[in-house]
Amino acid sequence: MVPDADHLAVMRPKDRSHGDWSTNIAMQLAKKAGMRPAELGQTLAEALRKVDGIAQVDVAGPGFINIALDSASAAAVVDAVLKAGSSFGSNDHLSGRTLNLEFVSANPTGPIHIGGTRWAAVGDSMARVLEANGAKVVREYYFNDHGTQIDRFSRSLVAAAHGEPVPADGYKGSYIDEIASRVVKEAADEGQDILAMPRVRDEDGAEGDSPQREAFRTRAVPMMFAEIQQSMRDFRVNFDVWFHENSLYESGQVDRAIDELRAKGDIFEKDGATWFRSTTYGDDKDRVIIKSDGHAAYVAADIAYYLNKRRRAKDPCDEAIYMLGADHHGYIGRMMAICAAFGDTPGVNMQILIGQMVNVIKDGQAVRMSKRAGNVVTIDDLVDAVGVDAARYSLARTDYNQSVDIDLDLLASHTNDNPVYYVQYAHARSKNVDRNAAQAGIDRSGADLSLLDTAADNEVLGVLALYPNVVQTAGDQKAPHRVAHYLEQLAGVYHRWYNLERVVPMEPTGRVDLDQDEDRNPQPARAAARLRLNDAVQQVIANGLGLLGVQAPDRM
């Protein structure tokens, strides 16, 4: 008879005079019970009034049940937070599931750009949230070291090393000159004059498939790979797997995957090319996997890579999650067809998340240039401008389905308009309260939490109680921005509480009217209770920031 969770709502009323919690259960059950919602609401309210810890139950409107807890029950969340500590908010409802989360996966042809930086922040935060929900998460970076992008990169390096113009389809930026110089020096240190190696011009006049281009590729790709890895580590993103696309070809996995599809009747030949009959599985058109010139199309590696994720010896995944940029909408149909072709369920065994654009703003104007990378803003540009904490938080706090503006001036400011400062300052402020309380000799042990009975106390308690549900919802929806929004809500009520309710008594003035003022100088029992509440807020902010990969500072 109880409705499912998608339709049953238990929420905090916007108007706190309506109580601590409100539910629509009477409206959901009324038809099955053969009663009017308001009538059923009264029946349920009578039963709820007999429950220990509930101070008041009212039925409002068409059947909403509003519940007010007594102060001791409302404050029970404080003990729950402090007992659980860093694990408060975590749950195990995704335990037993292995999720492969692939994100960033930028081509190894240059520094991570701002779009990839957003995926680094969102992806790692999402992984942390999913782990807090009990899942085993494999963070994976797919290193595209096979195909035309690498050829363009190598041609660009050869041209730079010889002081020649950038090829028509080449890469530019000072990083190309840097890497070209490093390659030449590394080769020279090993006794090789790489610039004297044979060259071949292609039909466009650029460097063709020459021994020199191959030598540059062999040395430069690992350099770029190491640079990307370091950028990720500096951004507090630690991948479990760095997967090389080339390995799919070298190990024969691409050929075996195609053979498996051929045995199912899903491969055919046309116009000298080999095709995947993906329309059988909902794609809008069939896909070429081996081109007429014998070279593999990108989708060939996609097929083998999905199978690898599902069948690998270590941590095969129940669900492969791909985080892709806004220009990859066309990928969805073919990828879901690959999933279905191997007997898996799209949306269950595979999920594709498409992110939107990032705009970097400085002095009210869009920033489009990097000193090192030319016409793109890189991860290092952003971190140099605002730091890792502000960069991660600002990129993770907006739903990845929406474009986001990163205002460098705002993120560098120490004002309440800066969301990461606002949240981190709440944590630092709570730590300062701790230090002042210790200096004042306040004993928090055995605190009577029923003394947390003011409106400001109740507001903080109510928001604290929301955190476990926020974590679960963020995990179910793969939406780490919900954690950031919650932290800003908690920081807001905490700052208001701090300004209204003293924890540490003020210095005595000798004036009875001031020194006996409960607001100015709370009695030891009330001070101890407030200190425990302060501790609970501190813990939850630290937990939430941890899910976003952001530090919780002791001082600011």
Task: Locate each region found by the language model.
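Non-catalytic interaction-recognition regions
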Residues: 1-75, 82, 86, 93-556
